[in-house]
């Protein structure tokens, strides 16, 4: 039995990836019809939209994660395996790992996306990504550790590098992170670090295009720009990064910025798997799928979420890489596969539920079709939408209490610089 998964008379569906798409599909597919195997490198689901709040000490990591095994403990004939995929043979329907191989009948590719450094090794070496909970914790530790080091330093230049923060990418992640950092500078630094001059801390937000939040309307972009400018964020539009060194960044306008924390939020690319290279033929290294989420070049292979490139009449350049797309595709495909007659099928139709981004306390932008909201109402909408999509009652409650507490007292209670302790016996 490969991976201790018993043979079954039912068709075996293997899901690669436990993100929004893979997690939702595994919940919706009928285990009375199929044997289900969910493979992910982690044993938990992580709620990506709130990574930046973990990095800013606003919420604890466990409140945006949910154990996969706990979620499926009452569902029969589903097997969770924590593995790294080495290669997939879609012709013979075999998955290879370092542990062994596994045969499938139906393959669901939901590997998501990873940070795109555009082939620049320096960008990858000297910046901090924000695509996982572990990376969010690493960024949190970097921020706190550098502030502690800044308190000890009498060198103005060193303090500048330790206190300044540079964010590359003016999409939702970059905007939300810049706003959270600005509020930390205003409300937290003077109280926790009275020995430091908080006014010397600079937050730079760099965007290659002509506006922030360029996937939203111009109203949203302008509002985000105005609010962040009022909050003291230095915004660089129409500006590209030409080079990055250990603690210095060079911009296309000739400006040099110094910081030990350069955060990369400037784009993603599909997570590729060996053996599927021929399918990664779409922009952003995605896998082209038809209107039924099928990978046309192979039988019984489907792709969902960020890894899938699906063109529609409304989205000729492909559906956006958003959680609602992944969730809707997963529900659609599970419903299709649960039916016995797959020939009578309807094409996937994406329902655009709008987009939103928070800028700071009581500040957000929200758009749905022709409706545009900003300020407190949009912020409340952002809060409740994110609480709604969190997995687990405990997580919803903890995040709500943390947000309420932070709102009332202007403080964040999770500023802990926890460094991993490596046992001496492993230091070989």
Which stretches of residues belong to each language-model region?
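Beta1-alpha1 glycine-rich phosphate/pyrophosphate-binding loop at the start
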Residues: 2-79, 172-215
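Short hydrophobic core segments
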Residues: 16, 102-112, 241, 257-267, ...
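A Rossmann-like FAD-binding core segment of flavoenzymes
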Residues: 76-87, 182-291, 297
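FAD-site-proximal beta/loop scaffold in flavoenzymes
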Residues: 125-155, 248, 256-328
């Amino acid at each position: 039995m490969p991976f201790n998964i018993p043979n079954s008379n039912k068709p075996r569906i293997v899901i690669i990836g436990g993100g929004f798409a893979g997690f939702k599909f595994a919940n919706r597919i009928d285990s009375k019809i199929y044997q289900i195997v969910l493979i992910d490198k982690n044993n938990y689901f992580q709620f990506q939209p709130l990574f930046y709040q973990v990095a800013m000490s606003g919420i604890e990591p466990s409140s945006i994660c949910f154990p996969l095994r706990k979620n499926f403990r009452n569902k029969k004939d589903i097997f969770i395996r924590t593995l790294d995929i080495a290669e997939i043979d879609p012709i013979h329907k075999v998955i290879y790992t370092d542990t062994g191989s596994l045969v499938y009948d139906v393959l669901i590719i939901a590997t998501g996306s990873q940070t795109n450094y555009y082939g620049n090794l320096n960008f990858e070496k000297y910046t901090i990504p924000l695509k996982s909970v572990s990376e969010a914790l690493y960024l949190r530790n970097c921020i706190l550790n550098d502030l502690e080091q800044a308190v000890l330093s009498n060198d103005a230049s060193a303090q500048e590098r330790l206190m300044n923060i540079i964010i590359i990418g003016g999409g939702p992640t970059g905007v939300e992170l810049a706003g959270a950092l600005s509020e930390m500078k205003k409300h937290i630094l003077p109280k926790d670090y009275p020995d430091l001059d908080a006014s010397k801390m600079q937050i730079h937000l760099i965007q290659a295009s002509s506006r922030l939040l360029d996937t939203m309307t111009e109203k949203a972009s302008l509002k985000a720009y105005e609010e962040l400018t009022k909050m003291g964020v230095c915004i660089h539009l129409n500006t590209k990064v030409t080079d990055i060194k250990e603690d210095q960044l060079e911009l296309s306008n000739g400006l040099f910025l110094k910081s030990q924390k350069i955060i990369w939020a400037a784009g993603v690319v599909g997570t590729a798997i060996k053996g599927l290279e021929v399918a990664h033929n779409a922009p952003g290294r995605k896998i082209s799928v038809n209107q039924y989420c099928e990978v046309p070049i192979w039988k019984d292979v489907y792709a969902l979420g960020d890894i899938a490139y699906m063109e529609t009449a409304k989205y000729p350049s492909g559906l956006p890489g958003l959680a609602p797309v992944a969730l809707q595709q997963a529900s659609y495909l599970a419903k299709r596969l649960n039916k016995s007659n797959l020939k009578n099928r309807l094409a996937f139709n994406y329902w655009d539920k709008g987009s939103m981004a928070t800028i700071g306390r009581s500040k957000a932008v929200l758009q749905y079709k022709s409706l545009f909201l900003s300020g407190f109402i949009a912020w409340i909408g952002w809060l409740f939408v994110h609480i709604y999509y969190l997995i687990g009652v405990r997580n919803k409650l903890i995040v709500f209490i943390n947000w309420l507490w932070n709102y009332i007292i202007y403080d964040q209670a999770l500023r802990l610089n926890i460094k991993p302790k490596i046992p001496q016996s492993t230091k070989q």
